[in-house]
């Protein structure tokens, strides 16, 4: 009996040490650090890069660690071989003048060049909708005949339907002004419940006809705010919130990736003690008795847009006095750190749901989408492609560039399955950004239907590339807030999950409302964490 017990004990000791991570305070206290820092920042997206930038002249020994070989996170400027003179944005692609103040400040400090994002969010006379099999102009969607049986009241408010529903639900009159966060979180519906406690369906079922609700859902296009358990407050913030109130829509001449790249480079140039280590995956985080943190990194390899963990290589052991986790919530939830499993943290991170997103770019030798009676530069639809944007013509090759699909939610997940089937098309980029025959065929079948042309009447793509924000470490293009959570009740926990630890979390996934879908959210969270805990 005793010998059997000893054998089991030995087996247990071997298993807990097999992955190279200390499992108790005594082991962690004995761990030998390969390098030590005052601050370790994990993640080189906008949140991590801005954290490093703000601390660049602090006099602290700081290191930034990145999972892949790329700086940028969900900002990803890309080029295709036949259109090298044109930046493709397969991540975040634009920003709003007058609404995103932190980004404007950073752009100015880095000396970057804003330029107008020509199509904005879709402009009158240049945008169409394809809904329930009908092609409609933007004007028709606002005030014309639509394939939805709207009530007389809904018809009278067709061009301001979301605001009309907010008025009926809460009695709030905006009178041309924005819906402010502090106001939105106090709004109640007639039965006394807070608006943020309701889902989109629960809220609109109180005031909308069934057809009116579907019209609002379909014209919103993005599914993040209008499906499953998304808080009803999300769609009202998206359409009416103060972060949406601005003027022109811009992008950057240098590409959107130039923001995190510029922030990180400025950090590195500021002091010799500032360091950057790409291709390091944070596996586990531990704390010693003296308060120092032990970070265990797995080496990774990046090739053709795909990063893989080198499981057979030894772990890198890094120690730090303080840690900033600039990680998407999808990756954060998978980190081996016990404090993320406490009830307080678990409840806080449950407030947000990662939303898969995707973009598929294609180039053509002619702009077939502008050569028929339904021509448009932007098309938004309930069909599989979801959104299409004319990008621009390459002066290098004369080819025309198209975002053939910009989707989220279940559509993005379905398209991802198609991407993983069949052969790559001729002209596809290699590796993770590939476009396969099933993916190309499905998108173009729905897109040509929306434009009212035969599939065999358009040319095949010259080149193509895709980006699916579905896999580790991102897991999503952005998050949506779930019904039942008050932002101010959980945000401090999201950004500091353990009050006894100097471990902080930054990134757009931990920001409020609309800006959680934008770089502004990453800049806001990193700015607040650095100002509150480091400066």
Swiss-Prot record:
The residues that the entry says bind substrate are 94, 406, 513-514
InterPro entries in UniProt: Amino_oxidase (IPR002937), FAD/NAD-bd_sf (IPR036188), Flavin_monoamine_oxidase (IPR050281)
Location within or outside the cell: Secreted
List residues binding FAD. 46-47, 66-67, 74, 91-94, 513-518
Family label: Belongs to the flavin monoamine oxidase family.
**EC number(s) recorded for this UniProt protein:** 1.4.3.2
Q: Which GO terms describe its cellular component?
A: extracellular region
Instruction: List, alphabetically, the Pfam families matched.
Output: Amino_oxidase
For this entry, the protein name equals: L-amino-acid oxidase
Q: What keywords is this UniProt entry annotated with?
A: Antibiotic, Antimicrobial, FAD, Flavoprotein, Fungicide, Oxidoreductase, Secreted, Signal
Q: Which GO terms describe its molecular function?
A: L-amino-acid oxidase activity
Q: Per the UniProt entry, what species is this protein from, by scientific name?
A: Aplysia californica (California sea hare)
Q: In which tissues is it expressed?
A: Expressed exclusively in the ink gland. Within the ink gland, it is only detected in amber vesicles (at protein level).
> Which cofactors, by name?
FAD
Its job: Catalyzes the oxidative deamination of positively charged L-amino acids L-Lys and L-Arg and, much less efficiently, of amino acids L-His and L-Tyr. Has antimicrobial activity. Inhibits growth of Gram-negative bacteria E.coli strain MC4100 (MIC=0.62 ug/ml), E.coli strain C921-b2, S.typhimurium strain AA 140 (MIC=0.62 ug/ml), P.aeruginosa strain PAO1 (MIC=0.31 ug/ml) and V.harveyi strain BB170 (MIC=0.25 ug/ml).
Q: What's a BP term from Gene Ontology annotated to this protein?
A: defense response
Catalytic reaction annotation: an L-alpha-amino acid + O2 + H2O = a 2-oxocarboxylate + H2O2 + NH4(+)
Q: Where is the signal peptide?
A: 1-18
């Amino acid at each position: 009996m005793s010998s059997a017990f000893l054998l089991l004990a030995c087996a247990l000791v071997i298993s807990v040490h097999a992955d190279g991570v200390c499992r108790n305070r005594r082991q962690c206290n004995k761990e030998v650090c390969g390098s030590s820092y005052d601050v370790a920042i994990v993640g080189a997206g906008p949140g991590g890069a801005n954290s490093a930038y703000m601390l660049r002249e602090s006099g602290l020994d700081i290191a930034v660690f990145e999972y892949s070989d790329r700086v940028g996170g969900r900002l990803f400027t890309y080029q295709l071989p036949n259109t090298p003179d044109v930046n493709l944005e397969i991540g975040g692609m634009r920003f709003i003048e007058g609404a995103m103040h932190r980004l404007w400040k950073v752009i100015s400090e880095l000396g970057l060049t804003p330029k107008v994002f020509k199509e904005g969010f879709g402009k009158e006379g240049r945008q169409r909708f394809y809904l329930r099999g009908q092609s409609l102009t933007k004007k028709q969607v606002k005030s014309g005949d639509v394939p939805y049986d709207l009530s007389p009241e809904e018809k009278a408010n067709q061009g301001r339907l979301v605001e009309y529903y907010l008025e009926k639900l809460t009695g709030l009159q905006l009178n041309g002004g924005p819906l402010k966060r502090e106001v939105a979180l106090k709004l109640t519906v007639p039965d006394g419940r807070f608006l943020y406690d309701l889902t989109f369906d629960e809220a609109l079922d109180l005031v909308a006809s069934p057809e009116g609700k579907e019209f609002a859902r379909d014209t919103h296009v993005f599914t993040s705010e209008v499906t499953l358990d998304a808080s009803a407050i999300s769609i009202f913030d998206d359409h009416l919130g103060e972060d949406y109130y601005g003027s022109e829509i811009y992008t950057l001449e240098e590409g959107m990736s130039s923001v995190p790249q510029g922030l990180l480079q400025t950090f590195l140039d500021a002091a010799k003690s500032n360091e950057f280590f790409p291709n390091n995956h944070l596996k586990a985080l531990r704390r010693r008795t003296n308060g120092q943190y032990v970070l265990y990194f797995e080496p990774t390899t990046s090739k053709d847009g795909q990063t893989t963990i080198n499981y057979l290589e030894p772990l890198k052991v890094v120690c730090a006095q303080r840690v900033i986790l600039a990680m998407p919530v999808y990756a954060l939830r998978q980190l081996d750190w016990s404090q993320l499993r406490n009830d307080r943290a678990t409840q806080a991170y449950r407030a947000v749901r990662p939303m898969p997103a995707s973009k598929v770019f294609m180039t053509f030798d002619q702009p077939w989408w502008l050569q028929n009676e339904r021509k448009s530069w932007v098309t938004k639809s309930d069909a599989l492609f979801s959104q299409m944007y004319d990008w621009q013509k390459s002066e290098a090759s004369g080819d025309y560039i198209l975002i053939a699909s910009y989707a989220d939610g279940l559509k993005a997940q379905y398209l991802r399955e198609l991407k993983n089937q069949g052969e790559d098309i001729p002209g596809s980029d290699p590796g993770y950004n590939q476009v396969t025959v099933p993916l190309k065929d499905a998108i173009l079948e729905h897109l040509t239907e929306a434009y009212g042309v035969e599939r065999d009447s358009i040319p095949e793509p010259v080149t193509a590339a895709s980006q699916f924000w579905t896999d580790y470490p991102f897991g999503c293009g952005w998050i949506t807030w779930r019904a039942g959570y008050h932002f101010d009740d959980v945000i401090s926990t999201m950004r500091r999950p353990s009050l006894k630890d100097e471990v902080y979390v930054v990134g757009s996934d931990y920001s409020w409302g609309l800006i959680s879908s934008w770089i502004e959210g990453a800049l806001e969270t990193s700015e607040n964490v650095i100002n509150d805990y480091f400066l």
